[in-house]
């Protein structure tokens, strides 16, 4: 706290000193802000005014420039201007300037939020306002302080807690008890009751070591199982003498001289994960014929690829551990009796390419009975509590045991995962995919404009509950947690915000919390592989792909005909919604005549054959047709309906490579960018948004290019320059293609992902057992917040019924 106050005082004093030495310059600047009247100014607006003013004399404003460039927003209530200043990711200060009196004062988070609320209320709310603050519960909890440590939580946790827990022999007893507690459905693993003390454990390990060093390394565990039982050792150490000896050496090293790296390796080696539940309630979750349906996109692909890799890793580790246990993975989603031609009405569906993974579907129900039709992800909240109870019963029925890990996906899945983990006492993992608060700017302060349509009061509350309850959080990128130097991260945006009339969040999450871990996914390499692998190419699809791209026929699957089929293709594939910005790409292309001359545009989005139930998609459809007419794009553009066959989509990416085209991802914000990974894995040069995950996936100019969709003219110029360089240098396209592939192999594969997830589950499961990582105090606070606030918000959401739509 002292450091924070010192920083605030330093900031206030710096600004005050700048006012004293440069009063005229700063009056001129802040007057520009005040003259815009009551409202909120975003970072780019603040800097635009600043840059316009300093153009004539930059030296005068230099002392203030660093402060202003760190400001993320300003609240203007004349004569006051309040600034939210972010010196670095995860660190925030708040100040207020009275332009009339040249006075500067620091603000607490609560004071800043109360000031901000006046934008809506028009006056300070003098009544007591509910404030949500998780900071006191984490005050004594270890956390890193450097931005570079964000997202590397498990490494920090291991360093801190291994030194704390293993400082003397007595402190090692939790590890002994943890190993003794290991069992699966009543079958003891690792240690039996013959070992009662650390001395006994070390003695048995030494005897086992001596025995193993005297037999062939490939001796199966079954040949010395009984001898080990007499020593107090059970199955789980390994499947052969060498692997058992390696595990024993790891533990002996830990008992002698604890080391965080060895601890993580040991915990990743021992058996801890056999039953996994993955929750993804909303949308149409199935293996085919669903991509492009409302609320159905990258998350479905992510989970299906995830479970295949995870099952393979679980089977491999179980075999290496010398166990005869069958793992089970359940993807739990909503059952839709009105399945509209999909398998979403089928209770259990085997996941293709797996042996022990099923999709388990459980219906939404209320006092009106089972809900038959799809509803928007924004309308699910009144159903989730009852749904959780039904899911718990179905899981126990299918698994005949509690899961070892529950993984939530998106806001609804994470809330159900929270309720289940709380009920069953199971390790919980959270994957956000996208936090809507960042996708819809100012949806917190101007909640009234959004809430009747999107029910964000429910969703933001559910997000806060889940992210604070969970044991660990997986993100695909650093940006998802803490943004970049200039942009705020998705989770970071939940540090402090206000929902006027409901509550203020003065400390909602700490991005330095060691529960955060970056674990990036990949693409299914049996589907997405480089276009150069000619013997694997699916040429049987080429006639269908040529029909999609070049047919002279217009129908419900493809609209508009390309005039020049010899041009390279600018290709994009996404859902048709505002944030994905497919209409923005079309407008950018339409405005730039040079770009139209250089390349054709092919977009895959929406469904021409079915009237969407989603209002946002309906609006984008109308806008798209308007842009195509406005810029006379017939002959230059091909608009293809959403494609459900991902195997053919893989070959479609490779076919675009054959045209020497590019993949463009133009989203205003993209949490990760699975299509970016897919395109790069196929060798297709990729040009993607700089907002969100693609900014990390792509190294600009090496493995692809960045564009800013908020500056569409510059984005179009980047595309023009790319194609011009390709014309001038025949190796340029290949260099970007190969750079993308190299980036994928280094960081973005499902094999790396599944190995990391297994290790994280072991490490967090261990620390949860041996320490206060369960955060009991926090969870009691969450229980109260859930009961008193979330439930009332959820009950206020109109209950969807069959025969009408409340979709958005």
Curated annotation (Swiss-Prot):
Q: How does its activity get regulated?
A: Activated by phosphorylation at Ser-10 by CPK23.
Catalytic activity from the UniProt record = an NDP-alpha-D-glucose + D-fructose = a ribonucleoside 5'-diphosphate + sucrose + H(+)
Q: Does the keyword Glycosyltransferase apply?
A: yes
Tissue specificity here reads: Predominantly expressed in the leaf tissues. Expressed in seeds, and at lower levels in roots. Expressed in leaf mesophyll and phloem (at protein level).
One Pfam family assigned to this protein is SUS_EPBD
Induction info reads: By anaerobic stress. Up-regulated by sucrose, fructose and glucose and by sugar starvation. By submergence.
Root EC class: transferase
| GO MF assignments | sucrose synthase activity
| Family of this protein | Belongs to the glycosyltransferase 1 family. Plant sucrose synthase subfamily.
Instruction: Please describe what this protein does.
Output: Sucrose-cleaving enzyme that provides UDP-glucose and fructose for various metabolic pathways. Functions in developing seeds by supplying substrates for the biosynthesis of storage products.
Q: What is this protein called?
A: Sucrose synthase 2
Specify the species.
Oryza sativa subsp. japonica (Rice)
């Amino acid at each position: 706290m002292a450091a924070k106050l010192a920083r605030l005082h330093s900031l206030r004093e710096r600004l005050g000193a700048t006012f004293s030495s440069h009063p005229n310059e700063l009056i001129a600047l802040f007057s520009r802000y005040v003259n815009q009247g009551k409202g909120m100014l975003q970072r780019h607006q603040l800097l635009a005014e600043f840059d316009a003013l300093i153009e004539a004399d930059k030296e005068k404003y230099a002392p203030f420039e660093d402060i202003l460039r760190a400001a993320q927003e300003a609240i203007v209530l004349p004569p006051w201007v309040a600034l939210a200043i972010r010196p670095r990711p995860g660190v925030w200060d708040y100040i207020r300037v009275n332009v009339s009196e040249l006075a500067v004062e620091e603000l607490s988070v609560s004071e800043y939020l109360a000031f901000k609320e006046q934008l809506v209320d028009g006056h300070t709310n003098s009544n007591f306002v509910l404030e949500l603050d998780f900071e006191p519960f984490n005050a004594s909890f270890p956390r890193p302080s450097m931005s570079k440590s964000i997202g590397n939580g498990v490494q920090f946790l291991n360093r801190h807690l291994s030194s704390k827990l293993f400082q003397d022999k007595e402190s090692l007893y939790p590890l002994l008890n943890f190993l003794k507690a290991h069992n699966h459905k009543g079958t003891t693993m690792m240690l039996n009751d013959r070992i009662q003390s650390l001395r006994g454990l070390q003695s048995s390990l030494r005897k086992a070591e001596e025995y193993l060093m005297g037999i062939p390394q490939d001796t199966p565990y079954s040949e010395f199982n009984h001898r080990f039982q007499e020593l107090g050792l059970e199955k789980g150490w390994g499947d052969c003498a060498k692997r058992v000896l390696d595990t024993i050496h790891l533990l002996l090293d830990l008992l002698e001289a604890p080391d965080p790296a060895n601890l993580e390796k040991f915990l990743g080696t021992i058996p801890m994960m056999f039953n996994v539940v993955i929750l993804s309630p909303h949308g149409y979750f199935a293996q085919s014929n669903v991509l492009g349906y409302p609320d159905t996109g990258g998350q479905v692909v992510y989970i299906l690829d995830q479970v295949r890799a995870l099952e393979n890793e679980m089977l491999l580790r179980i075999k290496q551990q010398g166990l005869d246990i069958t793992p089970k993975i359940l993807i739990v989603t909503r059952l839709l009796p009105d399945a509209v031609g999909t398998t979403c009405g089928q209770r259990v569906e085997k996941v293709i390419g797996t042996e022990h993974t099923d999709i388990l579907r459980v219906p939404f129900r209320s006092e009106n009975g089972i809900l038959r039709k799809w509803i928007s992800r924004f309308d699910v909240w009144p159903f989730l509590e009852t749904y959780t109870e039904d899911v718990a019963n179905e899981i126990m029925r299918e698994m005949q045991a509690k899961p070892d890990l529950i993984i939530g996906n998106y806001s609804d899945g994470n809330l159900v995962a929270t309720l289940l983990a709380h009920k069953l006492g199971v390790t919980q993992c959270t994957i956000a995919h996208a936090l809507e608060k960042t996708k819809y700017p100012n949806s917190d302060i101007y909640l009234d404009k959004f809430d009747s349509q999107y029910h964000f009061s429910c969703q933001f509350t559910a997000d806060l509950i889940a992210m604070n309850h969970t044991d660990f959080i997986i993100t695909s990128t650093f940006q998802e947690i803490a943004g970049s130097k200039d942009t705020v991260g998705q989770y970071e945006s939940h540090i402090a915000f206000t929902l006027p009339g409901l509550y203020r969040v003065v400390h909602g999450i700490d991005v330095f919390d060691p529960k955060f871990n970056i674990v990036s996914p990949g693409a299914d390499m049996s589907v997405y592989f480089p276009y150069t692998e000619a013997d694997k190419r699916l040429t049987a699809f080429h006639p269908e792909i040529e029909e999609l791209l070049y047919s002279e026929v217009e129908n419900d699957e493809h609209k508009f005909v390309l005039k020049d089929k010899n041009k390279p293709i600018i290709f994009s594939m996404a859902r048709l919604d505002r944030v994905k910005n497919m209409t923005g790409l079309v407008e950018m292309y339409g405005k730039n005549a040079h770009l139209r001359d250089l390349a054709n545009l092919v977009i895959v989005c929406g469904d021409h054959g079915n009237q969407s139930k989603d209002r946002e998609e309906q609006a984008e459809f109308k806008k798209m047709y308007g842009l195509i007419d406005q810029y006379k794009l017939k002959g230059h553009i091909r608009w293809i309906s959403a494609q459900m066959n991902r195997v053919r989509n893989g070959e479609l990416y490779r076919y675009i490579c054959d045209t020497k085209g590019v993949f463009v991802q133009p989203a205003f914000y993209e949490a990760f960018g699975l299509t970016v990974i897919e395109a790069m894995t196929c060798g297709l040069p990729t040009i993607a948004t700089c907002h969100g995950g693609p900014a990390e996936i792509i190294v600009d100019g090496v493995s692809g290019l960045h564009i800013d969709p908020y500056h569409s003219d510059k984005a179009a110029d980047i595309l023009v320059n790319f194609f011009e360089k390709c014309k001038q240098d025949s190796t340029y396209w290949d260099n970007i293609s190969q750079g993308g592939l190299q980036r994928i192999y280094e960081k973005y594969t499902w094999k790396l992902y599944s190995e990391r997830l297994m290790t994280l589950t072991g490490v967090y499961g261990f620390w949860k057992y041996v320490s206060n990582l369960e955060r009991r105090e926090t969870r009691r606070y969450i229980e109260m917040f859930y009961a008193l606030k979330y439930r009332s918000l959820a009950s206020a959401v109109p209950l969807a019924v069959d025969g009408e739509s409340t979709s958005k």
